């Protein structure tokens, strides 16, 4: 195969760029959670949560102290009635030392770890909300200046079956469970 002399630098540049692009560390489609010891995933049996998670008195709730992106968080996990993990929230108090740049750094860490692009829903300097959803699993980052910052991993309801069910009901068709 012949390569023109003009194309060679471009090919080398493309190879370098593709080699430098880091693969995502975590898979949101699989519900993987980027925090804590061991790999924790949404949809897993909550009884299998690894240390440092501890069960609380309230059924279906666990707590832990975790770190992510160099930030210390208090974390809580919630399970549904069947004991399946559905939500993990990491939160930290904001003593006034957080700024939009800190929130942006947290969002960038999540984007890099998951290979996603969290979308700003609200970002006005005192309240920021970013979100991303993939295959019924979502990540949200919420910051309220002077109050708290939180990071939530959550299993959500698939919308397509709900839309199909609503369309069938509107058409007067029998809805299949």
Where do the language-model regions lie?
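Bacterial N-terminal signal peptides that target proteins for export
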Residues: 1-10
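Residue-level detector of functional hotspots within protein domains
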Residues: 6, 25-28, 63, 71-76, ...
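Short, surface-exposed loop and linker segments with low hydrophobicity and enrichment for Pro/Ser/Thr
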Residues: 7-8, 70, 75-84, 142-147
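Residue-level signal for mature regions of secreted extracellular proteins and peptides
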Residues: 13-14, 129
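C-terminal motif of bacterial Sec signal peptides marking the signal peptidase cleavage site
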Residues: 16-19
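Non-cytosolic coordination micro-motifs
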Residues: 23-59, 87-177
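Compositionally biased P/S/T/G-rich terminal and signal peptide-adjacent segments
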Residues: 51-52, 56-82
